[in-house]
UniProtKB/Swiss-Prot annotation:
Belongs to the ubiquitin-conjugating enzyme family. Ubiquitin-conjugating enzyme E2 that is essential for peroxisome biogenesis and plays a key role in development, pathogenicity, and cell wall integrity. Required for long and very long-chain fatty acid utilization and is involved in lipid droplet accumulation and the elimination of reactive oxygen species. Controls the expression of proteins involved in protein biosynthesis, fatty acid metabolism, cell wall synthesis, oxidation-reduction reactions, as well as of the enzymes involved in the biosynthesis of the mycotoxin deoxynivalenol (DON), including TRI5, TRI6, and TRI10. Keywords: ATP-binding, Nucleotide-binding, Peroxisome biogenesis, Transferase, Ubl conjugation pathway, Virulence. It comes from Gibberella zeae (strain ATCC MYA-4620 / CBS 123657 / FGSC 9075 / NRRL 31084 / PH-1) (Wheat head blight fungus). Pathway: Protein modification; protein ubiquitination. This is Ubiquitin-conjugating enzyme E2 PEX4. It holds the Pfam family UQ_con. PROSITE patterns: UBC_2. The gene is PEX4.
């Protein structure tokens, strides 16, 4: 086996061990977690593809009635590299691309360290909903509303979007 293949296999084993520990942590903390309804692998046999279902209860900014499915792709080099997270359910937010669900959050890019877990990333993404960063928008229209000071208009837009059946995850 070439060295690069053995390094990849070792990294993947290391990632799997870490993810199993993170799943154990989630199973202990799940009952107290109000904003994350579900977190874990999509299929039992693949630890590298996860999903989370998050809700907007208590976030404010119009997101309280929202419920979203988030895809989490974990690289074989995890925890040295961050997971890639995208919203599957459409969402209106300055830091989330409406077209593809891409999330702009430093924690998932340059600010990543192996000290973070997938659960902490999901919590951070959920927190981002209530604390938008208009300096690095992926949805420039919503960011422009906020920058212009139209907080009420933005909240009403988000509320309308969260109540639309096509923009609310209705699965398990």
């Amino acid at each position: 086996m070439p060295p690069s293949s053995s390094n990849t296999a070792a990294a993947s084993r290391s990632a799997s061990k870490r993810l199993i520990k993170e799943l154990e942590t989630w199973s202990r903390e799940q009952k107290e977690e109000k904003g994350i309804e579900r977190l874990g692998p999509v299929n039992e046999g693949d630890l590298m593809e996860w999903e989370a279902v998050i809700n907007g209860r208590g976030i404010g900014q119009g997101y309280d009635e929202g419920r979203w499915l988030v895809n989490i792709s974990i690289p074989s080099t995890y925890p040295l590299a961050p997971p890639k997270m995208t919203f599957v359910t459409p969402i209106v937010h300055p830091n989330i691309a409406l077209q593809n669900g891409e999330i702009c959050l430093d924690l998932l890019k340059d600010a990543w360290t192996p000290a973070y877990s997938v659960l902490e990333c999901v919590r951070a993404v959920r927190m981002l909903l209530g604390c938008p960063e208009t300096d690095s928008p992926l949805n420039v229209d919503v960011a422009a509303l906020l920058r212009s000071g139209d907080v009420l208009g933005t909240r009403k837009l988000v509320e309308l979007w969260c109540q639309d059946s096509d923009s609310r995850y209705e699965g398990p």
